[in-house]
Design a protein with these regions (language model features):
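Hydrophobic, gly/ala-rich membrane-insertion helices/peptides used by toxins and envelope proteins
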Residues: 1-5
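Metal-dependent nuclease catalytic core centered on acidic motifs
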Residues: 6-88, 117-204
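Low-complexity, polar-biased intrinsically disordered regions enriched in Pro/Ser/Thr/Gly
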Residues: 90-96
Length: 204
């Protein structure tokens, strides 16, 4: 496992030369959609953050957020799930192929629905958001849990449910590359759906 200016990185990922590695590619969407904090126009990867959240400012400065941007640079869609998101949801829009402005190629609005039970949240809320976006051809490949609001066990239940139902007629589930979980101890857990292997990264 390597370390670069962008924080902990995935195995096999190229090492960034400087922090400009992210900032030079960053294009803030501003008021066009406040829920998307980072979008990489080259790869289509993105990081979703709930604006106005009490941890927003500190969240953008930590190693986990840099890790999320590293994933986005490689074309992953990454959710930042705030610990105080109890009701309602996170809505977001994405351009199918990018463009000079956000509204050039909108493909729809999708919702992450927060439920009261963590296991149900992992099983139905997050994965339903993935499948709805997948139906529109958007690549979503990772779930990013900033403050450990979803336990490793509940995520595993969601993975088990996903694997059990994937490929079933009418399920509508997309091919998911992997699931990323960050717990309160800043431990990074990546479940590779392609190899069914689990690996841990720890903040140094």
């Amino acid at each position: 496992m390597g370390k670069g200016a962008g924080g902990t990185r995935l195995l096999g990922a190229p090492k960034p030369k400087s922090h400009a590695y992210f900032t030079s590619e960053r294009k803030r969407l501003g008021t066009l959609d406040n829920n998307i904090d980072y979008y990489n126009w080259k790869t289509g990867g993105f990081v979703i953050w709930q604006e106005g959240h009490k941890h927003a400012n500190e969240g953008r400065k930590n190693d986990e957020f840099r890790f999320a941007k590293e994933l986005a640079r490689h074309g992953y869609g990454v959710y930042l799930l705030p610990e105080d998101a109890k009701n309602g949801g996170i809505s977001f829009r994405l351009s199918a192929k990018g463009g000079s402005t956000f509204s050039d190629a909108k493909v729809g609005t999708y919702y992450y629905e927060q439920t009261t039970k963590k296991s149900d949240n992992a099983k139905y809320g997050v994965l339903s958001a993935l499948q709805h976006a997948g139906d529109k051809g958007i690549k979503l490949a990772a779930i990013y849990d900033k403050y450990g609001s979803l336990s490793r066990l509940s995520i595993q239940k969601g993975i088990d449910w996903y694997e059990h139902n994937r490929g079933k007629k009418g399920s509508g589930l997309i091919k998911l590359d992997g699931v990323l979980v960050v717990n309160k101890n800043h431990e990074l857990y990546w479940h590779d759906m392609r190899t069914s292997e689990n690996e841990w990264w720890e903040k140094k």
